[in-house]
């Protein structure tokens, strides 16, 4: 299974908009490739994430769970990238300070 971060972003946009056209506008891509990518994601996962009709899109139970997990994954990736950047710039790190008493008793 090879799920790309962009697939998670695409799914989140469709899940939040509940409309492929609006999600495509939000993502600045055309609607047909967005639909294809969501179908590919569903095939990779092996579960239907969205219930589609001619006029609407609804999340399935699997889709609701996947939405929560996808949001958490993207947040983790963003936080990891931010921490790595701060460490690289010296803004974050770990300092250990030790103390030994050598005063006579």
State where each predicted segment sits:
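A short LG(V/I)-centered, amphipathic sequence patch enriched
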Residues: 42-59
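N-terminal winged-helix
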Residues: 31-32, 36, 82-105
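Alpha-helical linker/hinge and terminal dimerization helices associated
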Residues: 44-45, 66-88
């Amino acid at each position: 299974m090879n799920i790309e971060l962009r697939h998670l972003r695409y799914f989140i946009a469709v899940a939040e908009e509940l409309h492929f056209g609006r999600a495509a506008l939000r993502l600045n891509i055309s609607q047909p490739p967005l639909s294809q990518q969501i179908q590919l994601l569903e095939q990779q996962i092996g579960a239907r994430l969205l219930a589609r009709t001619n006029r609407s899109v609804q999340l399935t139970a699997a889709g609701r769970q996947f939405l929560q997990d996808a949001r958490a994954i993207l947040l983790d990736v963003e936080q990891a990238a931010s921490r790595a950047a701060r460490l690289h710039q010296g803004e974050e790190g770990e300092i250990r300070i030790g103390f030994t008493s050598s005063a006579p008793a």
